């Protein structure tokens, strides 16, 4: 899943970016509100993590402008622990959740995955398709055993799992799995699909190519 991270503390931003990538997210990282507003207007994200106190435009105004444009992606605000008024205002202008600093990475990851579940209309922490199980703590099981995946493979399989039995285009996968700094092309998706197919071999789950539509994750005994 691709997310936007906007945090003006560069050391904290780079630390968070690294941790989120390791957890399977594709991350675009910016350090001020103007850049965040521009990317949210021009790029497609599954969710956004915004610090409130940023130069150029604060996180509250970024959220407000986002909602005025009719964009519904989930937003989590990072706030100072004492800034109760900012947290209330953030929720009132359209933020979905907030996390006071300092925080643990485990809590940030859990809150982000909860936001993704809600935005997808799902309430269960475990998603299952045949012998493939995805837990929102960030791991897959195949035939009851942990499925070894690189962060990029996991990000791609996660998108397919949330959209299981429905086709996802190559461009959609590219936009949700890679960040702006990744020097790759949409054709790179085929390489990752090939790797995932090899790892799913021997199970009742497959990734089917639908000409003109993209890829679909489905049961092996279903008509593709």
From Swiss-Prot:
Q: What is the lineage of its organism?
A: Bacteria, Pseudomonadati, Pseudomonadota, Gammaproteobacteria, Enterobacterales
4-aspartylphosphate PTM positions: 51
Question: Can you name this protein?
Answer: Transcriptional regulatory protein TctD
SMART domains reported for this sequence = REC, Trans_reg_C
Alphabetized Pfam families for the sequence: Response_reg, Trans_reg_C
Gene Ontology, cellular component aspect: cytosol; protein-DNA complex
GO molecular function (one)? phosphorelay response regulator activity
Described purpose of this protein according to its UniProt entry = Transcriptional activator of the tctI tricarboxylate transport system operon.
A single GO BP term for this record reads: regulation of DNA-templated transcription
Which stretches hold the DNA-binding feature?
121-219
Domain Response regulatory residue range list: 2-116
Induction and repression of expression? TctD expression is regulated by catabolite repression.
Q: Which NCBIfam families match?
A: PRK15479.1 (NF012023)
Keywords from the UniProt entry = Activator, DNA-binding, Phosphoprotein, Transcription, Transcription regulation, Two-component regulatory system
Q: Which InterPro entries match?
A: CheY-like_superfamily, OmpR/PhoB-type_DNA-bd, Sig_transdc_resp-reg_C-effctor, Sig_transdc_resp-reg_receiver, WalR-like, WH-like_DNA-bd_sf
Q: What highest taxon heads this organism's lineage?
A: Bacteria
């Amino acid at each position: 899943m691709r997310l936007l991270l906007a945090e003006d503390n560069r050391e904290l931003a780079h630390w968070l970016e690294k941790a989120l990538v390791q957890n399977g997210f594709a991350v675009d990282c910016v350090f001020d509100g103007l850049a965040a507003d521009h990317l949210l207007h021009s790029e497609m994200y599954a969710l956004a993590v915004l610090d409130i106190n940023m130069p150029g435009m604060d996180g509250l105004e970024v959220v407000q402008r986002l909602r005025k444009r009719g964009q519904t992606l989930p937003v989590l605000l990072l706030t100072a622990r004492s800034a109760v008024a900012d947290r209330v205002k953030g929720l009132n202008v359209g933020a979905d959740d907030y996390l006071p600093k300092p925080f643990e990475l485990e809590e940030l990851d859990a809150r982000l995955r909860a936001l993704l579940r809600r935005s997808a209309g799902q309430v269960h922490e475990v998603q299952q398709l045949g012998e493939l199980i995805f837990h929102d703590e960030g791991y897959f099981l195949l035939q009851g055993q942990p499925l070894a995946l690189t962060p990029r493979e996991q990000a791609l399989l996660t998108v397919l799992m949330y959209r299981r039995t429905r086709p996802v285009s190559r461009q959609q996968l590219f936009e949700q799995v890679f960040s702006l700094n990744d020097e790759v092309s949409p054709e790179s998706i085929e390489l990752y699909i090939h790797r995932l197919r090899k790892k799913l071999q021997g199970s009742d789950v497959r990734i089917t190519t639908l000409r003109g539509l993209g890829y679909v994750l489905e049961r092996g005994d279903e008509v593709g």
